[in-house]
C-alpha cells in the first residue's frame, strides 16, 4: 500500500469534464509556441514571446485545479525540504570544484548576488510550475502510468534545451526526478528552490564558453558562430533573448554575473 501522502498526487490528476483531446491540444499549442520562440530570430521573437506568455497564461487560468493540486499549498512542505538540502550539497561540491579549477565567477558581494539572480530564482519557480502543473498534469491523464507521464514531461523539458548538449544532459537528469518528487509530495516550493540553487550554481561555476551562456535553440547556434574562444568577461544574459531557462519562452534572462574569472 502506498503512503497516504503519495496517493492524492495521482487522484488529483483525474478531472471530471476534461477530455483527452483537450489535454493533447493544449500540450501541442503550448509546446509549439515555446519552440517557436526558441527558434525564431529577433524582432519577431519578441512578439512570439508575448503571444506564448498570453496563450499559456490563458490555458493555465482556464484549467487551474486549485492550489493544493498545483502544489502551492503547505502539504508535505517540511517532508520534502530534504530536496533543498540535497541541492545545496550538490551546489557546495560544484562550487568547491569550480574554485579549485579557477572557473568560479560569483558576484563580489551579497547585494550584487541578490540583484543578479533574484529574477532567475523567480523564473525557476515558473519553470517548475509549467513542467509539473501544466505538462505533467495533462500527461498524467493521457498516459496509463505516472512514471510514463513523468518521463514524457521530462523529455519535452529536455528537448526544449536543444541543441545545448550540456543543458540537455542536466535536464534529462533533473526533469524525471523533479516530476517523480512532485508526484510523491505534491509540493512545488522545494522543487523551485532546488531548481534555483542548481541553476545559479551553473551560472557561477561553469564558464560561458562551455555552456554557451546557458543558451538554447537559435541563441546557442549564434553563440557558436560568433564567439569560439573562451571569453575573459562574462556578460549578463539580459542582452540575450534565447536562454535555456526559457521553458515558456526561452527569453527570460538568467542574469549571470558580469565578472568572469579566467579559467
Q: What are these regions, as identified by a protein language model?
A:
Residues 59-68, 97-98, 181-185:
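Structural signal for the C-terminal ends of transmembrane alpha-helices
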Residues 229, 253-260:
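N-terminal polybasic/positive-inside topogenic patches
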Residues 16-64, 79, 83:
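Alpha-helical transmembrane segments in multi-pass membrane proteins
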Residues 36-41, 96-106:
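Juxtamembrane "helix-exit" motif on the non-cytosolic side of transmembrane helices
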Residues 1-17:
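Short, Lys/Arg-rich, polar N-terminal cytosolic tail immediately upstream
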Residues 106-159:
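Function-critical hydrophobic alpha-helical transmembrane segments in multi-pass membrane proteins
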Residues 168-226:
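Functionally important transmembrane alpha-helices
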Residues 68-72, 99-111, 212-215:
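Membrane-interface helix termini and inter-helical loops of multi-pass transporters
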